[in-house]
Amino acid sequence: IVIVPVIYIFGMAFSNIRTDIPNQLWPENPNLEAFRYLFNETNFKKWYWNTLSIALINMFVGTVLITGAAYVFARFSFKGKKAGLLTILVLQAFPSFMGLIAMYVLFWKFNLLGQPRALSILYIGGSIPGNLWLIKGFLSQIPKDLDESAMIDGANKFQIFVRIILPLAVPILTFVAVSMFMGPWMDYMLPGYLLRFEPLNAPDGYDISNQWTLAVGLFRFINDLNYRHFSAFAAGAILVGLPITALYMAFQKYLIEGIMAGATKG
């Protein structure tokens, strides 16, 4: 059930089918025409860079901000703590598409329409509620005796956070970081809605496809009759899956530990 569709996608990627879906699992004469078409006749490299930059910003900046906030909620007592946690919990119940109009107005007011990297603001904000609760639940299970012992030895709060808390939280942080990388990687809704407008003061003859992400660009190959190319779509899908596969292979141990930790400590 799983292997056959994968083989079919690979077979389609190595064929040269532009308008019709191939009716065989593997082409009789495999070739690289679809890959050449992607790199030579489209802005695929630009789409890839736009998506990769958004995902990396979301992963690094988002993980740092969420980890810091989760540490504060897990280790400190302050006025409004319970209300803040309750608010974050409630925000998880609302789907992201409910805020599309507000997102458009926000981007329009700040002249961010057509700016791919600006999407990171929305992705980071949208990932805060669930991931903050996940990391906060993990950090709350780390004994506070470790903090007190370190303070007796002369460590301050920042040193405790960096030298004790972070090393112990590597599994859950890795899980959250990879999840935040995957979030914008193949998302179509936000870029499809906010990147269809030209940026402010765009020059004459501006190619709007330069600001697309992978999802928006690849979807054109199966949705636009003038550019329909199923083999190019399949070839792009294979290249899209490479970073995710590499991340899972590199951090498999930590991801499994993070999933288990989230299931038992969240």
PLM features: what roles do these ranges have?
Residues 1-266:
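A structural signal for multi-pass alpha-helical bundles of membrane permease subunits
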